[in-house]
Structure formats: structure tokens, C-alpha cells
A protein has these predicted regions:
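A short beta-strand micro-motif common to beta-rich folds, especially ectodomain repeats
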Residues: 1-2, 80-92
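C-terminal edge beta-strand
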Residues: 6-16, 93-104
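Surface-exposed binding patches on compact interaction domains or structured appendages
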Residues: 19-20, 43-71
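Solvent-exposed, low-complexity, repeat-rich "mucin-like" stalks and linkers
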Residues: 19-49
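Short, solvent-exposed loop/turn segments enriched in Ser/Thr/Gly
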Residues: 33-39, 77-86
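N-terminal carbohydrate-binding accessory modules
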Residues: 103-161
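An active-site-proximal structural segment forming one wall of the substrate-binding cleft
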Residues: 142-160, 177-208, 212-251, 265-281
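Active-site region of glycoside hydrolase catalytic domains
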Residues: 227-328
Length: 328
């Protein structure tokens, strides 16, 4: 600015409409045992934070600051190494932080026990019902989500085996191939990890699941259901293959069978389950598997079941019945 005899310079600093910087943008080798990570966020506005994976949570305060360290908890990972992301948004600006987490170390006790030996090790079992098999989602029937603290409490009460009934049909994202949503496979794996990491024998099944199998042990549905049974068990077995002998697979739940014709169809479903699991190799090549009697009723099983299905591995099959007979 100029006056008659005075000259003065004024510095003008223009602030960007939106500014957003995050650092670091990548976390490598995050402990599988769980960890807390911090992201430095520099901004001139209110940032929206979206965590794109359920195993991370934002534990930061919401103080209005131009620069702050935002903290996130990364849950324990009992599966395989995984990658997630956190997205920061301010106006039209987006920054993404990628998190690579290792797998936690669960001591591996091997796969040496056959069916008789393994059954003898399970002395008290707990069925976690109305959760992972619930129609509409894990909490749809009124129970909270399964946590590791819950599993630890069951163990403290003296139980050493857990049955996890599971729904799968409602989580299929491609009906043509029966492809299961990766997020659901991850969730089941997470719960199995809670159990095995706490030294609990664990049974995973295909439960009622809308009745597509257990209400249709009939010749007209046999081919269609065997295709679906094979596709589902291939995916389940592959996803959980890394667990040792403390994990068992159960092919069905309570298949409704009234006669020899329907029993033959059920046998084919059970054979498909066994063959699909064994074909995935790895630990599943020798994993102990559980097959279900008709209606899981002991009298009907004694009358209709006959010989056990064929298995390429000797002495690795168990038969399942439920305590419904006698009744009044």
C-alpha cells in the first residue's frame, strides 16, 4: 500500500478450503495378538472416519484439533494374515490407511488323535445356540455377539468342548456358485479362533440353514443339494484348514428322514460332505468328521443308518445323535 510518503507491504496467506494429511498410510506387521495403532491426522476441518473392517475400532477422542493422533484398536487375529483399511474423508479429499496384520500364534497340538481318542478327550460340551445360526444375523434372536471373553467364561465353568451351529445359506452372495460372503467366513473363523486358542474342542456344522438340506432328504432334491453341499463344505473346509485336531466338522444338523429311501439320500449328503472336506487337503485330509443319524434320533439311527459312509482315512468318523428318545 502506498501513501504520500509511506509504503507498506501486507502478506496475504490463503487457506485451502479443505486440507487433509494422514501419516503413516501403511502399517506392516501388526501383531496378530492385537495392537493399538496411531494415525497422525492434520486437517482444517472435521474429518469423517470409516473403518472398513470389523476387526478394527476407533478409540480416539473427538476433540476439535488441527492435528491429532487418532488411535485404533486392532483385534486379535486367530486366522491367517489379513489386510484392512481406514478411510479419512474431508469434503472431496480422501486418504486411506492400510493395515497389514499378522496371525496370532495358536500352539498346534497336531492331528494325531483318531475319532475314538478324540471323543474321549471331550468330557463336557456347550452348544452356543441362537447366534451364528440365527436367521437374520448373529444377534437377530436376541443374543449378543460371541466374544472371546464369553468363551473364556465357558472354559472357567469346566467345559472343554463347544458346538457352534452355523447358518450359511443366508450368506451366499452368488446363488449360481453358492459362493459364501468372505466377511461371514471371516466371522466364523474368528469365533473358531476364540475357541481353539483357549484349548476348547470345537465343532462347526451346517445347521438348519432354512431347511434346504435337512427338510429335503428326497430323491428329487438329491442332485441339487449335493452340489450345494459340496460347494459350501469346500469353502468352509478351506477357510478353517489351518486349525489342528481341536476343530471338527459336522456335515448337517438334524436331517429329517423317515424311511430307507430318504436314508439313502442322507447318506449321499454325508458322503459329499466327507469327500469335499478331504479334497481340500492339508489338515482336513485327516481331520475327524461327524456324520448325523436320521433326525439324530438314536432309535431311528439304529434302525435305518446301517454302515458308516466311506472315508479314505480309517477311524476318523464319528456318528451324532441327540437325546430325544425316549420322550413323552
Amino acid at each position: 500500500m502506498k501513501g504520500a510518503t509511506v509504503t507498506q507491504t501486507v502478506n496475504v496467506v490463503q487457506t485451502a478450503a479443505d486440507g487433509l494429511i494422514v501419516a503413516p498410510t501403511v502399517f506392516n506387521g501388526v501383531s496378530g495378538e492385537g495392537a493399538r495403532i496411531e494415525v497422525k491426522v492434520t486437517t482444517n476441518g472435521t474429518v469423517n472416519v470409516a473403518i472398513n473392517d470389523s476387526w478394527m475400532t476407533n478409540v480416539s477422542s473427538r476433540a476439535a484439533m488441527t492435528e491429532q493422533a487418532m488411535a485404533f484398536n486392532v483385534a486379535v487375529n486367530y486366522g491367517t494374515p489379513r489386510t484392512g483399511s481406514i478411510t479419512f474423508t474431508l469434503g472431496d479429499l480422501t486418504e486411506t490407511v492400510t493395515v497389514h496384520q499378522l496371525a496370532a500364534n495358536i500352539p498346534d497340538i497336531g492331528m494325531e488323535s483318531n475319532a475314538v481318542e478324540l471323543a474321549a478327550k471331550m468330557y463336557a460340551g456347550w452348544n452356543i445356540g441362537n447366534t451364528l445360526e440365527a436367521t437374520g444375523g448373529e444377534t437377530a434372536w436376541g443374543n449378543p455377539k460371541i466374544t472371546e471373553e464369553y468363551i473364556k467364561k465357558i472354559k472357567q465353568l469346566g467345559f472343554n468342548a463347544i458346538r457352534i451351529p452355523c447358518a450359511w445359506d443366508q450368506y451366499i452372495e452368488n446363488p449360481a456358485t453358492h459362493e459364501i460372503k468372505e466377511s461371514w467366513l471371516d466371522r466364523v473363523n474368528e469365533v473358531v479362533g476364540y475357541c481353539v486358542a483357549n484349548d476348547m474342542y470345537t465343532i462347526v456344522n451346517i445347521h438348519w440353514d432354512g431347511g434346504w438340506l435337512e427338510n429335503n432328504c428326497t430323491p428329487d432334491k438329491q442332485e441339487e443339494n449335493n452340489e450345494k453341499q459340496h460347494a459350501l463344505w469346500t469353502q468352509i473346509a478351506n477357510r478353517l484348514n489351518h486349525y489342528d485336531e481341536r476343530l471338527l466338522f459336522a456335515g448337517t444338523n438334524e436331517p429329517n428322514v423317515d424311511n430307507a429311501t430318504e436314508m439313502a439320500v442322507l447318506k449321499s449328503y454325508l458322503q459329499t460332505f466327507i469327500d469335499a472336506g478331504r479334497a481340500t487337503g492339508g489338515k482336513n485330509a485327516v481331520r475327524n468328521l461327524i456324520v448325523q443319524g436320521p433326525n439324530t434320533d438314536i432309535e431311528r439311527t439304529n434302525n435305518l443308518f446301517g454302515e458308516m459312509p466311506t472315508d479314505v482315512v480309517p477311524n476318523r468318523l464319528m456318528a451324532e445323535v441327540h437325546y430325544y428318545t425316549p420322550w413323552s
